[in-house]
Amino acid sequence: MVNKDVTKVCIGKIEELPEQLGKTVYIEDKELAVFKLSDGSIRAIENRCPHKGGVLAEGIVSGQYVFCPMHDWKISLEDGIVQEPDHGCVKTYETLIEGEHVYLVY
């Protein structure tokens, strides 16, 4: 159950999210990259690579990671941490599936 102090926003239906591909979603002043992984889970992260600002929704997904399309930085979709030898992080967002809809919770 979602706490009354948080916001829950519908970002679409599950079937609208292509598996292993990113989708750009705008919520208020935030630009997010949303991914449906091969296991059916949904992940949402900040849509800019911390290195040079690459659009992560355009990156290649492998397992629990997205690779920045600009310089191939490997970023965890679980915690937003850039994998070594590079370093940095992006903000991650909680997602929630209710029925056929996907929600961003923040």
From Swiss-Prot:
<dbReference type="InterPro" id="IPR036922">
    <property type="entry name" value="Rieske_2Fe-2S_sf"/>
</dbReference>
<dbReference type="GO" id="GO:0016705">
    <property type="term" value="F:oxidoreductase activity, acting on paired donors, with incorporation or reduction of molecular oxygen"/>
</dbReference>
<keyword id="KW-0411">Iron-sulfur</keyword>
<dbReference type="GO" id="GO:0004497">
    <property type="term" value="F:monooxygenase activity"/>
</dbReference>
<feature type="binding site">
    <location>
        <position position="51"/>
    </location>
    <ligand>
        <name>[2Fe-2S] cluster</name>
    </ligand>
</feature>
<dbReference type="GO" id="GO:0051537">
    <property type="term" value="F:2 iron, 2 sulfur cluster binding"/>
</dbReference>
<keyword id="KW-0001">2Fe-2S</keyword>
<keyword id="KW-0408">Iron</keyword>
<dbReference type="GO" id="GO:0046872">
    <property type="term" value="F:metal ion binding"/>
</dbReference>
<keyword id="KW-0479">Metal-binding</keyword>
<dbReference type="GO" id="GO:0106316">
    <property type="term" value="F:nitrite reductase NADH activity"/>
</dbReference>
<dbReference type="GO" id="GO:0042128">
    <property type="term" value="P:nitrate assimilation"/>
</dbReference>
<keyword id="KW-0534">Nitrate assimilation</keyword>
<feature type="binding site">
    <location>
        <position position="71"/>
    </location>
    <ligand>
        <name>[2Fe-2S] cluster</name>
    </ligand>
</feature>
<feature type="binding site">
    <location>
        <position position="68"/>
    </location>
    <ligand>
        <name>[2Fe-2S] cluster</name>
    </ligand>
</feature>
<dbReference type="Pfam" id="PF00355">
    <property type="entry name" value="Rieske"/>
</dbReference>
<keyword id="KW-0520">NAD</keyword>
<dbReference type="GO" id="GO:0005737">
    <property type="term" value="C:cytoplasm"/>
</dbReference>
<keyword id="KW-0963">Cytoplasm</keyword>
<dbReference type="InterPro" id="IPR017941">
    <property type="entry name" value="Rieske_2Fe-2S"/>
</dbReference>
<dbReference type="InterPro" id="IPR012748">
    <property type="entry name" value="Rieske-like_NirD"/>
</dbReference>
<protein>
    <recommendedName>
        <fullName>Assimilatory nitrite reductase [NAD(P)H] small subunit</fullName>
        <ecNumber>1.7.1.4</ecNumber>
    </recommendedName>
</protein>
<feature type="binding site">
    <location>
        <position position="49"/>
    </location>
    <ligand>
        <name>[2Fe-2S] cluster</name>
    </ligand>
</feature>
<comment type="function">
    <text>Required for nitrite assimilation. Required for activity of the reductase.</text>
</comment>
<keyword id="KW-0560">Oxidoreductase</keyword>
<feature type="domain" description="Rieske">
    <location>
        <begin position="8"/>
        <end position="104"/>
    </location>
</feature>
<comment type="subunit">
    <text>Associates with NasD.</text>
</comment>
